[in-house]
């Protein structure tokens, strides 16, 4: 009997520990890191040829790295602030033919930004393996570095010529700047956290602020970020 009681107590303790890992109370806190791949574009409106510009826009492949904290405010509900390094941008590819001359071009824009997201996260336990996580919240970003690479090929009956050009981006509000220095928007995420602490996640970043420098915003000219992010991570 004593052995059965001890065994039963051990099983109850194990079950309680597993449940505690799966749920999160208002007093719990965790720190974690995650990293992964971004697929990003910039959407344009109000420009001459905005529709054609968006049609020729391709996803730019970048990366992300985030340090975050989970702070419980209720059972399976918590706030997740973080500091994130985000590599985003866009690619534009197009071609035109006139008088037997074909001009094709590729423009790749890479932007490095430091972002501060604050997400509200709902955790839905899935038995003893882990929990589904649904998140949403705002972010503010600061563009710190960037570069544009242009590849142009002109093809004539006599042959073709290719030129390459690379320029650093300037961030600010003046007409000679390339992009605004700040960005804000909203994140929407879906992920899964194993009881071991490992996480898998997907996130959609919807840029809401105008990336066109303030002094260049004639008419309704607007450019906004669109970013799909995929990551793996670990929380302690």
Task: Label every model-predicted segment.
Residues 68-70, 119-123, 191-193, 233-235:
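Transmembrane beta-barrel domains of outer membrane proteins
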Residues 77-79, 197-200:
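Repeated loop/turn-to-beta-strand initiation elements of outer-membrane beta-barrel proteins
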Residues 1-27:
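Cleavable N-terminal export/targeting peptides
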Residues 32, 62-66, 78, 115-119, ...:
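Membrane-embedded beta-strand positions in outer-membrane beta-barrel channels/transporters
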Residues 26, 74, 86, 125-129, ...:
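Outer-membrane beta-barrel channels and translocator barrels
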Residues 30, 192, 224-236:
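Outer-membrane beta-barrel "beta-signal"
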Residues 41-60, 88-113, 143-183, 209-227:
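Extracellular/periplasm-exposed beta-strand and loop segments of Gram-negative cell-envelope proteins
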Residues 37-41, 85-89, 115, 124, ...:
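Transmembrane beta-strands of outer-membrane beta-barrel pores
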């Amino acid at each position: 009997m004593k052995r059965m009681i001890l065994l039963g107590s051990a099983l109850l303790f194990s079950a309680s520990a597993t449940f505690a890992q799966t749920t999160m109370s208002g007093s719990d806190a965790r720190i974690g890191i995650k990293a992964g791949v971004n697929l990003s574009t910039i959407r344009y409106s109000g420009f001459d040829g905005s529709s054609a510009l968006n049609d020729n826009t391709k996803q730019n492949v970048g990366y992300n790295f985030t340090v975050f904290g989970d702070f419980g405010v209720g059972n399976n509900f918590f706030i997740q602030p973080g500091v994130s390094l985000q590599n985003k941008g866009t690619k534009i590819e197009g071609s035109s033919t006139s008088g037997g001359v074909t001009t094709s071009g590729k423009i790749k824009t890479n932007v490095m930004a430091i972002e501060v997201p604050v997400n509200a996260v709902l955790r839905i336990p899935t038995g003893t393996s882990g929990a589904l996580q649904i998140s949403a919240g705002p972010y503010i970003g600061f563009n710190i570095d960037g570069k544009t690479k242009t590849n142009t090929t002109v093809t004539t009956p006599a042959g073709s010529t290719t030129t390459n050009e690379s320029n650093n981006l300037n961030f600010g509000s003046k007409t000679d700047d390339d992009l605004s220095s700040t960005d804000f928007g909203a994140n929407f995420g879906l992920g899964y956290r194993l009881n071991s602490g490992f996480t898998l996640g997907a996130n959609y970043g919807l840029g809401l602020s105008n990336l066109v420098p303030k002094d260049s915003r004639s008419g309704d000219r607007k450019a906004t970020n669109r970013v799909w992010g995929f990551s793996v991570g670990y929380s302690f």
